[in-house]
Amino acid sequence: MRKTFAAALAPLLFVLTAASPPELARWRAEASQVTITRDDWGIAHVHGRTDPDAVFGMIYAQAEDDFPRIEANYLTNLGRTAEADGEKAIWQDLRARLYISDNELKADYARSPLAMRRLMDAWADGLNYFLATHPNVHPRALTRFEPWMALSFTEGSIGGDIERIDLDQLKAFYSSKPIAAALTPWHELQGSNGIAIAPKLTANGSSLLLINPHTSHFFRSEQQVTSDQGLNVYGAATWGQFFIYQGFNAHAGWMHTSSGIDVVDEFAEKVERRGTGHCYLYGRVCRPMGFRPVTIRYRKGDGTFGTRSFTTYRTHLGPIVRSANGPWIAFAMMDKPVEALQQSFLRTKARDLASFLAIAGRFKANSSNNTLFADDQGEIAYLHPQFVPQRDDRFNYAQPVDGSDPATDWHGLHALSELPSVVKPASGWV
């Protein structure tokens, strides 16, 4: 080990921080419970007395390694990239704001279980402590982190479901500027893979799990995170998140592949003007169209800031993201940030396949990732994403379906037992 860092002993350079004395005292107390040890490859091995202490150290170590990536990820997911990158990022921010707002995230935080709130509190404290002790680090826009912000970014894959919303079409709808019709571009076929091998096929009689991260080398942080409350996990965390996305603990390992199956749906809505607003046909009723004002703040070339305001629309199925030769298109995807964050963290403490499945079945908040799993009891498995809506198979959901027909609605979620899976295969591998 070439470097040992005790967070409690970090120089407290608080001259430039706006933190209050009670905050500084709290951060010092949290830091005193954390040890970060760097091995010969620079990988952080974090230990905390409690799980929140470990999260405090985990995110502090990530910030040491690459604070700009952490900030960039939260600017993206909070819909605030234009505050750093300027007017060109307005449409990316508007896309994010279709699903989130500060007030909604604060309400989600308030309804979160106490244990999760404590983790989010520690996450924010760790980042703010880092900024307080590193006055030479200059954030582009996020100078302070709040606990509720963690709920904006709960899924660790390369691109979230929301990126299925086309920015050019979103811009055309909300700026009332038509765009030329374009052919769907052809993309080279790509793979996303992992391998789990049962003990009967291995030389040492233990399960094997191959994790292919299929990302650029520095897309995620590599860490070990432990606590006296039983957390003991090693693997890859997407920058800014306080859970190991792909990795293993003392008993089980998991990795994710992305297939894009059952992820999102689009609904073609028949919209009419009603007075000063709009309604959309649903069965025999024209329901009032929901709307929400959104204001995007953006950085100008001279360093000052401007704003641009929009009125966004939504049905009970989701926000309106484009029009298609008349009908407005509502976009439906998983929107369960509290449950998604709980599932992402708690599965890192699963001891075997049964406990991993219990967590997945409890929350059903993994929409875009298949899972390959292996444990030290010799169990291996392939698991489909757990957020799969029940759909009427008379309709082709590969295309926008008729949103005015109630039969096209989602009708709850499938039980795990109804989803594709391969558990303890006779072949001995998946």
What are these regions (language model features)?
Residues A7-V15:
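Bacterial N-terminal signal peptides
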Residues M1-T4:
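Positively charged n-region of N-terminal signal peptides that target proteins for export
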Residues T238-G303, S344-R347:
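Compact, glycine/acidic-enriched structural inserts
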Residues P21-R220, D228-L231, G235-F243, T315:
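Substrate-recognition/specificity elements adjacent to catalytic centers across diverse enzyme folds
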Residues M149, F173, S323-Q342, R347:
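Conserved, charged catalytic cores of large soluble enzymes
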